Curated annotation (Swiss-Prot):
Key words of the record: Cell projection, Cytoplasm, Leucine-rich repeat, Phosphoprotein, Repeat
This protein's name: Leucine repeat adapter protein 25
Superkingdom of this protein's organism: Eukaryota
Task performed by this protein: Negatively regulates TGF-beta-induced signaling; in cooperation with SKI prevents the translocation of SMAD2 from the nucleus to the cytoplasm in response to TGF-beta. Acts as an adapter that mediates the specific recognition of LIMK1 by CDC42BPA and CDC42BPB in the lamellipodia. LRAP25-mediated CDC42BPA/CDC42BPB targeting to LIMK1 and the lamellipodium results in LIMK1 activation and the subsequent phosphorylation of CFL1 which is important for lamellipodial F-actin regulation.
Single GO MF descriptor: transcription corepressor binding
InterPro entries (alphabetical): LURA1/LRA25
Segments for region (Disordered): 54-83, 141-175
Length: 189
């Protein structure tokens, strides 16, 4: 389960969850990009950002010692040169922007994972309450015969208290994230 309502097309432009704004166009294809694995998606995005940063850095950097020797013979540069402190400030700003973009994607991935976990937990709680309601309706007072096999010297049990229902077991989840969530919050159902 990826947390999407079944009526909506995953990854489409109109993919908006109840109460959440639609994903930006650049992120709309991310929902099913890697089978719902946000950690994998985060890793791919991080690699892509790192490669893009390296390519843009290589395009800005001179060609090494060969360029330096040619520049000494050619005189001043043909185009207007920015001051070194401005270049370093722009490089620092670019680096910070890439870091912020990666942090933003990481937080988005974590938020989406949390949303999916909450939805799974809601479904689990609804299933448990349904089982408890079903169990209590099966053990209601109307299901007991008038004479429950008691002898004359035994007192009948209090009719206002239902008998103890059999213990309910929580269905085992096959999702490691759900198990982590239960372990992290020490949820015992």
């Amino acid at each position: 389960m990826n947390g999407l309502p079944s009526a909506e097309a995953p990854g489409g432009a109109g993919c908006a969850l109840a109460g959440l704004p639609p994903l930006p166009r650049g992120l709309s294809g991310l929902l099913n990009a890697s089978g719902g694995s946000w950690r994998e998606l985060e890793r791919v995005y991080s690699q892509r950002s790192r490669i893009h940063d390296e390519l843009s850095r290589a395009a800005r950097a001179p060609d090494g010692p060969r360029h330096a020797a040619g520049a000494a013979n050619a005189g001043p540069a043909a185009g207007p040169r920015r001051p070194v402190n401005l270049d370093s400030a722009l490089a620092a700003l670019r680096k910070e922007m890439v870091g912020l973009r990666q942090l933003d994607m990481s937080l988005l991935c974590q938020l989406w994972g949390l949303y999916e976990s909450i939805q799974d937990y809601k479904h689990l709680c609804q299933d448990l309450s349904f089982c408890q309601d079903l169990s209590s309706s099966l053990h209601s007072d109307s299901s007991y015969p008038p004479d429950a096999g008691l002898s004359d010297d035994e007192e009948p049990p209090d009719a206002s208290l239902p008998p103890d229902p059999p213990p309910l077991t929580v269905p085992q989840t096959h999702n490691a994230r759900d198990q982590w969530l239960q372990d992290a919050f020490h949820i015992s159902l």
